[in-house]
Amino acid sequence: MATNISKMFVGALHKIAAQPWVYDLIQRAAGQRKCIELVRKTVATLPAQTVVDVGGGTGNFREVWPANCRYVCLDLEMPKLLSFRAKVPDGLAVLSDASRMSLASGSADVVTCIAVTHHLSGALLDRVMDEAFRVLRAGGRIVLFDPVVNRERWIGQMLWRLDRGAYPRTAEELREKLERRFRVTHWERFAVYHEYALGIGTKLASD
């Protein structure tokens, strides 16, 4: 009985957290500003005329890319896309499944997957990686950024218990998923409250 009540309570919290304004507030409280600045510094030299943000939500990471790039925010939650459109009127909001993107092959310079992979099963993540590979041009990059499991960080363990994602991974497991399709050209780990992994993979011209 107590377990069922606990599950219902967590489920109710997840529904509240999915509301765009609550989602943005939680991200800010969880140290998103530091994450944005780190990603901005890491991707500063990447060619980025067309950027596809997989699971882009409300578009909080739009600012790390050039103002004149073509920015596509792809998500499954319409309320978040509407919030994105309000914040980024010149961006393109696409309601779509990331494992079946309605985008042309070779049409993107960069595909980003930020704070998304822990919501995806292993098989689904493989399909998303395959789709990212398809829509990237030769030489294009995928930017993968996500919290990872570190059992030595007690605050991270606590945050995982509250997270909506059902598939947390270690940094090593996440890198293996990236290496399945891409050549890893950048990999680092850092901590805010969670521990994070930030990786860049390149689609080689010969692939």
Where are these regions (language model features)?
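Short catalytic micro-motifs in class I SAM-dependent methyltransferases
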Residues: A115-H119
